Curated annotation (Swiss-Prot):
Assembly behavior: Heterooligomer composed of large and small subunits.
Coiled coil: none
This protein's name: Exodeoxyribonuclease 7 small subunit
GO BP field: DNA catabolic process
GO cellular component: cytosol; exodeoxyribonuclease VII complex
Species name: Bartonella quintana (strain Toulouse)
Lineage: Bacteria, Pseudomonadati, Pseudomonadota, Alphaproteobacteria, Hyphomicrobiales
Gene name of this polypeptide: xseB
């Protein structure tokens, strides 16, 4: 079933919205029934969506913190994930 490819501002999309649009683009391209010019256009949008998803993942990764435990095993604070 051919799904509609969204247009508009990619930067306003959440990770989940961008990923869903990227999945629709892949499905449409894999079917092979999209005209060449349209294939190029949606491929370019797909690449922009992929980059947007990558930026959002990197931003989320930077926010992830590792919980530090005391010698007794109870939480005593947090530190950046990449600190050690």
């Amino acid at each position: 079933m051919k799904q509609e490819i969204q247009t508009g501002d990619i930067t306003a999309l959440s990770f989940e919205q961008a990923l869903k649009q990227l999945e629709v683009i892949v499905e449409n391209l894999e079917r092979g029934d999209v005209p060449l010019e349209q294939s190029i256009d949606i491929y370019e949008r797909g690449e922009a969506l992929r980059k947007h998803c990558d930026r959002l993942l990197k931003a989320a990764e930077a926010k992830v913190e590792k919980i530090q435990l005391s010698e007794e095993g109870s939480p005593k604070g947090v530190e950046p994930l990449d600190s050690k």
